[in-house]
C-alpha cells in the first residue's frame, strides 16, 4: 500500500472557487463581505501571515482592511479599535494577528471581539458553542483538518480519532470537532505513557506537536488516515512536518504533506467564516 497524498492546496483552491461564486451572489444583493486584520509591531512571520490573508480576500472578492499599530500601542487603544470595528457594518470579521507584545493581554483582546465577528473562532462564546455542538464560527485550522479528512470520503462516524497535541489552537478543538462528527476521540500529549499503543488504534491520526518527524511508521495502524499539522524548519532550511512522511507513506491510506497540506486550508476556512458572517448580518452596503 502506498498512501494517497491529500493535497491541501488543491482542496483549498476548490473551496476558494466556491466562495468566490458565493461572494458574487452576495454582491448582487448589495452585500460585500469585509474582514479587518489588526497587526501590531513588525514581526516578519506575522506580516507574512497577514499578506496571505489579504491575498486570499482579494482572490475571492472579500473587502479587507489592514490596521497597523506600533509595538508600543497601549492595550486600551487596541481595545478601543476593536470596539470601533465591532460597530462598523462594513466589517463582518475581525482578526487580531497573534502573538501580541507582552504588555498586552491576549485574552482581553480576544474577548473584546464581538462573537458575531469572531471569524477566528477563539472567543470563549464561540468555543462554548462549538463544545455544545451549536452553530458557530469554527477555529480555522481544526475546521480545515476535518474538511481534509472528509475529502477521503471516509465516514468519520464511529471511527477512532487519536490527536497528538493538546494546544488550545489545534489539538483540543480538533478533537471536539471530530467528537461532534460522532467519532471516538483519544488525546495524547507529553505526559502520555503508552502513546504508540494508543496511536496504533487510530483510524484517523492527527499530529500537532511541533517536533520534526516525531511520528514514524511504528506509530500507525495499517490503512490509517494521517493528518500532519506540524510545520518545522530544519537546519537545511527545508520545511518538514511532525510525521516522517517517507517512512509512513507505505503504512497509511491517506496522508497530508508539509508544506501544501493543512496550511492552505487555514486561511481558506477564515475566508469561509467571513462569508458566513456576511450572510448572517445581511447588511446592504450603501
UniProtKB/Swiss-Prot annotation:
Signal peptide segment: none
The encoding gene: folD
GO terms assigned for molecular function: methenyltetrahydrofolate cyclohydrolase activity; methylenetetrahydrofolate dehydrogenase (NADP+) activity
The EC number(s) this enzyme carries: 1.5.1.5, 3.5.4.9
NCBIfam families (alphabetical): PRK10792.1, PRK14186.1
Key words of the record: Amino-acid biosynthesis, Histidine biosynthesis, Hydrolase, Methionine biosynthesis, Multifunctional enzyme, NADP, One-carbon metabolism, Oxidoreductase, Purine biosynthesis
Originating species: Bacillus anthracis
Binding-site residues, NADP(+): 165-167, 190, 231
Family: Belongs to the tetrahydrofolate dehydrogenase/cyclohydrolase family.
Listed name of the protein: Bifunctional protein FolD
One Pfam family, short name: THF_DHG_CYH_C
Subunit structure: Homodimer.
Role: Catalyzes the oxidation of 5,10-methylenetetrahydrofolate to 5,10-methenyltetrahydrofolate and then the hydrolysis of 5,10-methenyltetrahydrofolate to 10-formyltetrahydrofolate.
One GO CC term on file: cytosol
Reaction catalyzed: (6R)-5,10-methylene-5,6,7,8-tetrahydrofolate + NADP(+) = (6R)-5,10-methenyltetrahydrofolate + NADPH; (6R)-5,10-methenyltetrahydrofolate + H2O = (6R)-10-formyltetrahydrofolate + H(+)
Pathway(s) annotated for this protein in UniProt: One-carbon metabolism; tetrahydrofolate interconversion
Lineage: Bacteria, Bacillati, Bacillota, Bacilli, Bacillales
Transmembrane intervals: none
GO biological process, one term: purine nucleotide biosynthetic process
Amino acid at each position: 500500500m502506498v498512501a494517497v497524498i491529500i493535497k491541501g492546496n488543491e482542496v483549498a483552491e476548490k473551496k476558494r472557487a466556491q466562495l468566490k461564486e458565493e461572494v458574487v451572489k452576495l454582491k448582487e444583493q448589495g452585500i460585500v463581505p469585509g474582514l479587518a486584520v489588526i497587526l501590531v509591531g513588525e514581526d516578519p512571520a506575522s506580516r507574512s501571515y497577514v499578506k496571505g490573508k489579504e491575498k486570499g480576500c482579494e482572490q475571492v472578492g472579500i473587502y479587507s482592511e489592514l490596521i497597523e499599530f506600533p509595538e508600543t500601542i497601549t492595550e486600551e487603544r487596541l481595545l478601543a479599535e476593536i470596539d470601533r470595528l465591532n460597530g462598523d457594518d462594513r466589517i463582518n470579521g475581525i482578526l487580531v494577528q497573534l502573538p501580541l507584545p507582552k504588555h498586552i493581554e491576549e485574552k482581553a483582546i480576544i474577548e473584546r471581539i464581538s462573537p458575531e465577528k469572531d471569524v477566528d473562532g477563539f472567543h470563549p462564546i464561540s468555543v462554548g458553542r462549538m463544545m455544545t455542538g451549536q452553530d458557530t464560527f469554527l477555529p480555522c485550522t481544526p475546521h480545515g483538518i476535518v474538511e481534509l479528512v472528509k475529502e477521503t470520503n471516509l465516514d468519520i462516524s464511529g471511527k477512532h480519532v487519536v490527536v497528538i497535541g493538546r494546544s488550545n489552537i489545534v489539538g483540543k478543538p480538533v478533537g471536539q470537532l471530530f467528537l461532534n462528527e460522532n467519532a471516538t476521540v483519544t488525546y495524547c500529549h507529553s505526559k502520555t505513557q503508552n502513546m504508540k499503543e494508543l496511536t496504533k488504534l487510530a483510524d484517523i491520526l492527527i499530529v500537532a506537536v511541533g517536533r520534526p518527524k516525531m511520528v514514524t511508521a511504528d506509530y500507525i495502524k495499517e490503512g490509517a488516515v494521517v493528518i500532519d499539522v506540524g510545520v518545522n524548519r530544519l537546519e537545511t532550511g527545508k520545511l518538514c512536518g511532525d510525521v516522517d512522511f517517507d517512512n509512513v507513506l507505505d503504512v497509511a491510506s491517506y496522508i497530508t504533506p508539509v508544506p501544501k497540506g493543512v496550511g492552505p486550508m487555514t486561511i481558506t476556512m477564515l475566508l469561509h467564516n467571513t462569508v458566513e458572517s456576511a450572510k448572517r448580518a445581511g447588511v446592504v452596503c450603501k
